[in-house]
């Protein structure tokens, strides 16, 4: 373990933020975990469990929950795990206490609805002196929290610093792989949530596993097309933060996005599904802004377009399926 990283801060005490804190604490480092809700911080500090968002997982004593973002300011690295639509607010609140040159690892997978910006741009807007990094890949919170084998991509431009950070956070069951394509990792993590909703809808409607597989494959083409147009590297999309995360999220009901799509396919309304949840489903906010981004770039993303139209209440699930099935036959192209 490198001596450079001894203390970590984690913004967001939902399931994923708590799981990351648990992973970081396994090697004995001190982890300051910021929770929005005072009762969540209290439960973590007293009962050593996040009963609201990650019930049943005993948390390491090295995790210190707090409601004060300034408590994270002296950490050697920050992991930003607040929902994508709240990332800007939390980063802005950290501005006064963060040391210049601190790595901020972005773990939220989404695009800001108000601006159309990915999280790295949001970070540059709010904390220009921070060093941006992105951690993304096929990883369910419960698996990471329980110490089950998981591999992710950690993308950062400074490979020396990235290597030090990976050495500090790697465990026998949590393996980050170093990359430098932050944009590619962000595109993969954002688009796969929307595609998972589509896959859930297909299974909820009983369209079968063949249709499910086709959605994953054609969805991957949409993801890659967007990434290449925006300037990302094709290789990134073949890795953990692209194809790996896509396959996991589109294939398991543990995924919030997949399960939301499944419920939509079975006839539940979006409002009723969201009302019954205490956790954010990132694909719901990402779908409309992803559609705007694709149109602004002149990119065809019919699956993501269909999901956005359903989410916005413009068409029914049945109409979306019909529209996709009626698309003209064409070559199986991936490149824009």
UniProtKB/Swiss-Prot annotation:
Belongs to the NAD-dependent glycerol-3-phosphate dehydrogenase family. Catalyzes the reduction of the glycolytic intermediate dihydroxyacetone phosphate (DHAP) to sn-glycerol 3-phosphate (G3P), the key precursor for phospholipid synthesis. Its main location: cytoplasm. The gene is gpsA. Its EC number is 1.1.1.94. It comes from Hyphomonas neptunium (strain ATCC 15444). One of its GO terms (biological process) is glycerol-3-phosphate catabolic process. Keywords: Cytoplasm, Lipid biosynthesis, Lipid metabolism, NAD, NADP, Nucleotide-binding, Oxidoreductase, Phospholipid biosynthesis, Phospholipid metabolism. This is Glycerol-3-phosphate dehydrogenase [NAD(P)+]. Pathway: Membrane lipid metabolism; glycerophospholipid metabolism. It is found in: Cytoplasm.
